[in-house]
Amino acid sequence: MWKTTDLCDEFENELQICRQPFRSFGKKEQFHGKIATVKVKDDNVLVKEGLQTLPEGTVLVVDGGASTNCALLGDNLAAIAEERKLAGIIVNGYVRDSSELKNINIGILALGTMPNRSVKEGKGERNISLQFGQVEWKPDEYVYVDEDGVIISDKSLHR
């Protein structure tokens, strides 16, 4: 079993440490996987498309610009991720249906909750580098999450 603290000790100069104040909403507190990215503004159509097409074990990283206008993820989309065996979802934005999310067996990080839904226009970008939390999130790199933090590596560290 790995811990972010141990990975930081062992690979100190090879990691990025995210400094975004995320809250955990999913059932899993610890998760890791290959990164896939989506950048959106108050629109979760590309989030849904990503969840429906990404391979098992992936972590979808959603940059919603920390917008407080709406939630980008709720129980329906999280259930798709669970059904498809994704490792987790990290949202630089907000979620809703938090009481249901805690029973969904994936990792879910977000800034907080917002009760209203997003627009459905399909605007945004996929598979691009994102920057938030003082780190760069690149597709096909690896993210490790537990109760102590979020770290990113350009290679798999999990043994």
Swiss-Prot record:
InterPro entries: RraA (IPR010203), RraA/RraA-like (IPR005493), RraA/RraA-like_sf (IPR036704). Its cofactor is a divalent metal cation. It catalyses: 4-hydroxy-4-methyl-2-oxoglutarate = 2 pyruvate; oxaloacetate + H(+) = pyruvate + CO2. Keywords: Lyase, Metal-binding. Divalent metal cation. Gene3D superfamilies: Ribonuclease E inhibitor RraA/RraA-like (3.50.30.40). SUPFAM superfamilies: RraA-like. A divalent metal cation binds at D97. GO terms for biological process: regulation of RNA metabolic process. Substrate binds at G74, D75, N76, L77, R96. It holds the Pfam family RraA-like. PANTHER family: 4-HYDROXY-4-METHYL-2-OXOGLUTARATE ALDOLASE 3-RELATED. Belongs to the class II aldolase/RraA-like family. Catalyzes the aldol cleavage of 4-hydroxy-4-methyl-2-oxoglutarate (HMG) into 2 molecules of pyruvate. Also contains a secondary oxaloacetate (OAA) decarboxylase activity due to the common pyruvate enolate transition state formed following C-C bond cleavage in the retro-aldol and decarboxylation reactions. Homotrimer. This is Putative 4-hydroxy-4-methyl-2-oxoglutarate aldolase. It comes from Bacillus anthracis.
